[in-house]
Amino acid sequence: MNSETRVKIKTIWISLLLLLGFLFLDRVLFPIALFEFPNELEWDTSPWYNFLHKQRNIRFEKDEKGILIAGSSVALYSAYPKQITDEIRTSNIKDGEKFRAEFYSHPALSPTDLHYYSDDILNKKPELVVYVLNPADLQLDYIQKKEYSEVSFDEQARLKDYKIRHQNRFIFPGEFLADHWKDYTKGEFFAQLTKALILLNRFRSFVYDPWIEYMEHHTRTMRSYHYYTGAMPEEGIFLRGWTPPRFTIECELKNGKLSEEIFVQKPGINVAIEEFTESGLPLKFISFGKTYTKSGWHSLVLETQKDRSSNVPQKAKFRFTVSPTTSSDEVDARIFGIAATYGIRLTQNFCRNEIRTGISYERIHGLDDDRIETMSDEDYLKDYEKRLYYNPENEGALNRLKKIQKNKEILGNSPYFTWSEMQFLEKTIAKFKANGQKLIIINSPENPIESKYYKNGNWYQGYLKFLSSHKSDTLGFYDLKDAIPDKKLFLDPHHLTFNGAKRSSALYTDAILNFLNVSTRKE
C-alpha cells in the first residue's frame, strides 16, 4: 500500500468519524439539550417548540384511558383538558376515573397536518381523539370567485404557501417532501431536504427560546416577557402584566420583605400600598406611598409587619392604589378597540417565588377577556371591528380575518364542493378506522356575527352532511356551531374568551360522554 492510498483511506476514516460525530451531536445530544431543558415558556409563546415538547412528552399509562384534543388555536381557545378530565372522572361513565385529556394542538393545525400527525397519534394509543374543527381550518383564504366562473379553491396558491409553512418545515419536513417533491424547484428541494436531515437546521428559528426564557427568569429581572405568570390579584390582571388602578394581591415575600419591580408609563404616577393585618383588615396607615417623577421600571422594597410569633413572615397581602391611571392606547393602541384603563405593570413572576415549568399549555385568565363580556352590544361591535379589522397604517389593506369573512360570504352563495383539506381529513378518518381508533369530530362554536355569512347556505349544509356521513361505531360527529349564541363570549370569529371556553369545554365533555356511552352499549 503506497502513501497516496494510505492518505485516501485515512481521509475516508476521518470523514466517516466526523460524520458520525455530527450525527451523534445532531440526533442524540441536541434533542436532549433542547427538549430535556426545563420548559418555562408560558401560554401562547414559541408555539412550535412548545408543540414539539408537548408531543414528545405525552404518555398514557397502561391503566389510563387517554383523550387527545387535537386542533388549531380554535381548540386551544375553546377547550380545557383539565376541566374535561375532571368532568369525565366525576361522571357515571364506566372507568371514568381512568380518563385523562391532553392537548395535541398548535396554531393553524389543518386537516393536512392532522394527517401527517396520525401515525404519532396512533402510537400514543389514546382511547379517544377529539378533533375540534372549524371551517376556517380548511384554509378558506384560498377560496376564489372569478368573474363568469364558479367558486373554487386555489390549490396552487395553497401548495406554494404550504411549502414554507412552519409545521411543514419544522415538524414533518421529510414526509411532506416525499409527497410533494415534484412541486419543488431544485433550490427548494435541497432546502427542504436539509431541514429533513439536520435537526440543527430544522429547529434553528426557535432553538434559543427556552434558553432565553430560562436566562430571563434566573439571571435577569423578568421585565421582558409575553404573558404574566405571577400571583393573581383578586381583581384580575391584563395578560401583559398591567393591573387595574386598584388591586389586592397576596405576595410571597423574600426574607420578610416585598422586593419587586413595577413599571409606570409616565411621570407623576402615585402608587400607594396598604398592608393587610392577620385579621384581614388593612392597616390604618399607608405602608408605602410614592410619586414617580420618571417613567419606566422602578424597584419596590417594603418592610412588612411581623406576625404575632415575631417570626419572619412568608406571605403578606397588600392593596395597591394607582393614580392617575394609564390608557391602554398610551401603551399600545393596537391591543384593544376600546381603550382599557391600566394602573401599573408588574414583572412577569411578581409576588411568586417559584418559577414554574410545564405551563405552556395552561391558558392564563386575563382581564382582556373579561372586559369583553361586560361590554354593551354597541361597544362590543365597535371594539370588535376596530380590534380585528381596522388597519390604521393601511386602511385599504385586507387582513386575513377580513379576507376569510369575505370568503365565507362567497361560500354562503355557493353549492357544496370539496378540496384537498377535506380529502386529507378523509384519509385520516380511514386510517383511524382501519386501526380501530375512536375519533370525535366537533364542529366548533362560532361567533354568530360571523357564522351568519354562510351557515344557512348550500355549501355549509353540504359540509355538515360530509362530516355526518362518516359517523360510525368508531367516529362521532357533533355540530356545535350554534351552541354558544352569546357573541360576547367570543374574542373573534372562533376563539372564545376564558369563560366562554369553560362553557364549550362542558359541551365537549357532553359530546365525549355521549359518544363513549353509545360506543359502550354497542360493544
Language-model features: locations:
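N-terminal Sec-pathway targeting helices
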Residues: 2-19
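Membrane/wall-proximal cationic-aromatic binding patches
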Residues: 22, 27-96, 116-117, 231
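Membrane-embedded segments
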Residues: 70, 74-165
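Secreted/periplasmic serine-hydrolase-like ester/acetyl group-modifying domain
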Residues: 147-244, 339-435
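Basic, ligand-binding patches in group-transfer machinery
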Residues: 223-361
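Active-site His/acidic residue clusters
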Residues: 403-409, 445-460
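A structural motif corresponding to the C-terminal end of an alpha-helix
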Residues: 425-440, 469-476
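C-terminal regions of proteins
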Residues: 454-456, 460-521
